[in-house]
């Protein structure tokens, strides 16, 4: 998968065919239905389920109303431009409930925990963990062997296309419920304390915290021991 810059993402979304995917449970004289090519069906006897775009399914249901006794419809998107990613493409641990859009790069042995949200164009390096409920906005970049804490937000930048994305270098640890604003660069080996609001670049091998975040100290042996990442959690 190729890396996308802002203009590529804008072009992708702008030109994509917008879809409203639906799943419909149907009951009736299903053998009498004339199903168009754009709808996939799984029928058995007088009951079954079908999948398709609402633009195709709605007229189909109306045209076949006489042969449909009842139906129940499920729908979780409207005019969506970006599908969900095919998770099978990644050599990573991705837990149930993670929301990952198409066109996201995820390195080997990365870990994406429950409830994490990863938007289009984001990049996650090898061995990095995105903890529960963390949000990576569009084009956010996370290097190798990082830990992005639960509830943390790495702000996304798709528009304007000239804006710089958030960049987190290798070996960075960010505590829970922190926020890193657009264009901020967090240097290699840095630690961002829980709850920090990071509005400016962070130097490598430093600890920052507070609102707004300020340098607290340089990384020392005590800090390293408290922020050690465990390779066993990244085993597949």
Swiss-Prot record:
<dbReference type="GO" id="GO:0019877">
    <property type="term" value="P:diaminopimelate biosynthetic process"/>
</dbReference>
<protein>
    <recommendedName>
        <fullName>2,3,4,5-tetrahydropyridine-2,6-dicarboxylate N-acetyltransferase</fullName>
        <ecNumber>2.3.1.89</ecNumber>
    </recommendedName>
</protein>
<dbReference type="InterPro" id="IPR019873">
    <property type="entry name" value="DapH"/>
</dbReference>
<dbReference type="InterPro" id="IPR013710">
    <property type="entry name" value="DapH_N"/>
</dbReference>
<keyword id="KW-0012">Acyltransferase</keyword>
<dbReference type="GO" id="GO:0009089">
    <property type="term" value="P:lysine biosynthetic process via diaminopimelate"/>
</dbReference>
<comment type="similarity">
    <text>Belongs to the transferase hexapeptide repeat family. DapH subfamily.</text>
</comment>
<dbReference type="InterPro" id="IPR050179">
    <property type="entry name" value="Trans_hexapeptide_repeat"/>
</dbReference>
<dbReference type="Pfam" id="PF14602">
    <property type="entry name" value="Hexapep_2"/>
</dbReference>
<dbReference type="InterPro" id="IPR018357">
    <property type="entry name" value="Hexapep_transf_CS"/>
</dbReference>
<keyword id="KW-0808">Transferase</keyword>
<keyword id="KW-0220">Diaminopimelate biosynthesis</keyword>
<keyword id="KW-0457">Lysine biosynthesis</keyword>
<dbReference type="InterPro" id="IPR001451">
    <property type="entry name" value="Hexapep"/>
</dbReference>
<comment type="pathway">
    <text>Amino-acid biosynthesis; L-lysine biosynthesis via DAP pathway; LL-2,6-diaminopimelate from (S)-tetrahydrodipicolinate (acetylase route): step 1/3.</text>
</comment>
<dbReference type="InterPro" id="IPR011004">
    <property type="entry name" value="Trimer_LpxA-like_sf"/>
</dbReference>
<keyword id="KW-0028">Amino-acid biosynthesis</keyword>
<keyword id="KW-0677">Repeat</keyword>
<comment type="function">
    <text>Catalyzes the transfer of an acetyl group from acetyl-CoA to tetrahydrodipicolinate.</text>
</comment>
<dbReference type="Pfam" id="PF08503">
    <property type="entry name" value="DapH_N"/>
</dbReference>
<dbReference type="GO" id="GO:0047200">
    <property type="term" value="F:tetrahydrodipicolinate N-acetyltransferase activity"/>
</dbReference>
<dbReference type="Pfam" id="PF00132">
    <property type="entry name" value="Hexapep"/>
</dbReference>
């Amino acid at each position: 998968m190729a890396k996308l810059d802002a203009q590529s993402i804008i072009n992708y979304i702008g030109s994509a065919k917008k879809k409203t995917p639906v799943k419909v449970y149907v009951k009736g004289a299903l053998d009498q239905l004339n199903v168009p090519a754009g709808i996939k069906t799984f029928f058995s006897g007088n009951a079954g389920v079908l999948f398709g775009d609402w633009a195709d399914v709605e007229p189909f249901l109306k045209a076949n109303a006489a042969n449909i006794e009842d139906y129940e419809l499920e729908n979780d998107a409207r005019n969506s431009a970006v599908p969900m990613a095919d998770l099978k493409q990644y050599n990573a641990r991705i837990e149930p409930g993670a929301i990952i859009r198409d066109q996201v790069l995820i390195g080997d042995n990365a870990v994406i925990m429950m409830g994490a949200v990863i938007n289009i164009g984001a990049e996650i390096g090898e061995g990095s963990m995105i903890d529960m409920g963390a949000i990576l906005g569009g084009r956010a970049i996370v290097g190798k062997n990082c830990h992005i804490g639960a509830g943390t937000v790495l702000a996304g930048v798709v528009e304007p296309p000239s804006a710089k994305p958030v960049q987190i270098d290798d070996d960075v640890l960010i505590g829970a419920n922190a926020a890193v604003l657009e264009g901020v660069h967090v240097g290699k080996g840095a630690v961002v304390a829980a709850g920090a609001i990071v509005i400016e670049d962070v130097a490598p091998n430093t600890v920052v915290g507070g609102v707004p975040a300020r340098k607290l100290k340089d990384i020392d042996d005590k800090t390293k021991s408290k922020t050690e990442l465990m390779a066993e959690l990244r085993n597949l």
